[in-house]
Amino acid sequence: MALFHHLYSLAGGNFADLNTAMIALLSKKDGAVKMGDFRPISFIHSVAKLFSKVLSIRLANVIDKLISPAQTTFQRRKCIQDSFLYVQNTVRKLQRSKTLALLLKLDIAKAFDCVSWEYLLELLEVLGFPPRWRDWIALLLSTSSSSCLLNGVPGDCIDHLRGLRQGDPLSPLLFILCIDTLHRLLEAATSSGLLAAPPAAAARMRTSLYADDAVIFINPVREDIDTLLGLLRQFGDATGLLVNLSKSSAIPIRCSDIDLATILVNFGGTTATFPITYLGLPITIGRIRLVQLQFILDRIRARLAGWKGRLMPLAGRRVLVRCVLSAIPTFALTALRALKKLFKEIDKSRRRFLWAQDDEISGAKCKVGWKTVATPEQQGGLGIHDLSRFAHALRLRWLWLAWQQPNRPWVGTDTPCDSGDVALFAACTSVSIGNGTSSSFWSSSWLGGRQLCSAFPALYAASIRKNRSVHEALQGDRWVLDLRHANSGNIACQVVQLAREIRSVGLVLDAQMPDSIRWTQHSSGMFSTKSAYTAQFAEGQLGSFRCLIWKIWAPGKIKMFLWFLHQDKLWCNDRLQRRGWTNCYFCPLCMRNLESSFHLFWECPISLKVWNQAAAWAGCQALNPDGWCSETTSTGCAERIITTAAPGNRKGTKSMLALIAWHIWLERNSCVFRGKQVDERHIVEACRRDIEQWRLAGAKCIEQSFGDMT
């Protein structure tokens, strides 16, 4: 604290000794020999980094007020897809309206490394930063230095004269302040007449910025292009952010009938055509095609190529499918309306890795149907995302943000949401009417928590103005006038019914209060992708699978075994018999009855002895078979054991249940495949040995005996 007080008061001292950084090279691949094979990383002194972090936290609280809507990076509540969606929608609007335009993708050369300190400090003064703040920034910049680590030995000190250090928490925020001036410069040039204004109906803003990725919309006129190039040169001279025109590109929109070569003669960059890639996603004029989403499949296959599925247990492959393969398409699915064929191809790769490891997949290798696998854990699945439903949940964020933050640049334009998304959003939200200007009369759930388009489909189909707001529709009963071309005899009853419902709520519009929306699928009332995804499985039957299988302390292979048991997918003799495969019919342990998974674990006399001995040894009477004799399913028996156990012992009882069932299965396999003689004492002893190993591994829920049932 004394050091921070010293820095706060700018009391002098040699801060340069604490504001150093070490630059090391990390290899990008094995056998790296060239400079291009290494990635430099800067390790900043912890004191300087802490001071910078404090300043960045304070600046982050006000950065939204200082930055124009054109910049969407390094800010809370904004994301990369905002910029992509705005640019794509603007391109499509220009294309549909047959408006001639050019999209310029600019490359800023070594953006972070070239920022002028003099420009930055002057900009902070213009933005109203107090002198003390500017002095702190000047101190951090002027005393910074770096040295290169060569074989672990630091080299000569390199003093900095410009630029912002990567790895510094404050650098990203300072950088977007610097580059945001480009947007304001072009807006000023447009206002003064130096640049012709873009079509207002199609492009709200001329510029879209994401960090140093800049897109500019401009009219395809040589004078405008030359003026823009001059402004970019002046901007680079003042800020140090020079545009590398050789790596920049111009993409024409509806410019097939003009001489682009003459217009772009001074541009110096390349000319491209749609589709193009912007921020890692394809921008297309028409419908997206599978070939434009091939990069998603390529990334998944590249991951699979480096994995050795044969060397992984099924539980490990499940984790990789859930956490890696299913996460790869998330970025694209948020902003794009993907094709069903893409989901099929991704599911094929996920299914193959899960069930067939590195071999070709076939139905015979899939132990459980994919529909069940791609179901939430609490409903009996493996919790692997159903990508089609997950994509719906991801896209609902656009409908939610359009309500919550209507100042985003893309609001009012097309979103990737389809009619199914709109219906799901309406079913999961409730709208409170204020002035009625934000709520859709037909699509919003403002009357009794339901959509009028669903409650009165005939009226909705007959309406000629389906996009009216509640405010517009109720003014003079315009919603009734919109039905004037319909067959009044068929819809008269519904008109009367809807009119009565509207009058019954006594709705009074308040011009001073905006409409509000609440997400009904979460107690906070705020949207989340997780709750939107879960809501799509509301019709499924909730069970105790998550608590009985996935939330217990046990190795992954035992959890997978329990899942197969609860799914009745273990290869017992009854399943073999149903398929007409060779089997010995009888239970290998007792040799009395047809072997089924239920008989093997819950009815077999040998298994019952094991449960009895385990209950006595562990002091857990919940494991006594007398408690589940009336149950008819494996899930029912397991639930009865858990509910019978004392509340404080239930976690340990779940682990004990899993371990005993696992060793019964191992003993059964030894009898079938090795011809071993059954010995229930061997099963109990094996359970005791594993319990000791689990305790050493950190299973606190079974550290002590359970004691009697309470």
How would you describe each model-predicted region?
Residues 1-4, 9-10, 14-22, 27-58, ...:
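A helix-boundary/hinge signal
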